[in-house]
Amino acid sequence: MKITRFWKHFLASACIIGILASGLPAYAAASPAQAAPEALELCNAAATPESVISLINQIGTVTRNRRPAIVAALNAYNQLDDASKAQVSNFSILAEAQQILGIQDALAKLSVNYDKVDADWSISTPYVDKSINRKNSGIYPWIYVSENATNICMNVMFHYIGSRRIDLKQILVRAGDEKYTFDCDTSYDGGYDASLKAWFDIEAFTMEPDEISWFGEWLSQPEVIARFIGWDSTTFDYTLTAPNRQGLSDVIDAYNLLNAATLEVRVKALRNL
């Protein structure tokens, strides 16, 4: 769905300026020696349901700084047999901590801006600024989380930068055998950037739920080409670069984790970055 002119400017400015409870391999690989002294003492002893419960209670508010405490609790829990695991009455806290930490790790790769007045978050890839400074065109997905994390909206911004003025009419994305069409409105949201000595135009779109899978389809292809088409039929082809691909992948990973989480988990992850 095409974004209105107001939202296009909002999106452009923001861009420019499920891990499951059963597993956390990256965290489990860390050394328990990183944990707090009291947690380390419990780790060095043979794990019991009681010691695991104690370790879980030490996790507290989940932030990335609490990773050692989460790792210590998880490592101890994994030492238990199934019967003993069933006696860990507060395992749900550990499971939630893993999920929150997974979301926070994904968001750590991105630019996250929180608006205290509107209580919303804008999440984008830091690759945007680097790309623009290098006068590169790009495809930039962008997440908007609003109403105290109740709503999650996925958007995509197409940014043309080049030596010719192009008032965009349409954008075609070719990925493998599939072609995706984005029709632009008649307003011109571009101009000439004197510092870059280049022309630019921006078009942003809100993705419908059934369209979000397009990003995965694009990433599955070795080559993705966006054709920028002007109202005067001028065209410019942009091939997705490796950094742009990584930025797109990072945003999609974060979106999938946020979308799969409960509202409570989502709020905790976002408010404790």
Feature names for model-found ranges:
Residues 2-14:
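Bacterial N-terminal signal peptides that target proteins for export
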Residues 15-23:
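Hydrophobic core
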Residues 23, 27-30, 99-273:
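A generic "folded-domain core" signal
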Residues 32-34:
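Intrinsically disordered, low-complexity terminal tails and inter-domain linkers enriched
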Residues 36-104:
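Beta-rich interaction/scaffold domains
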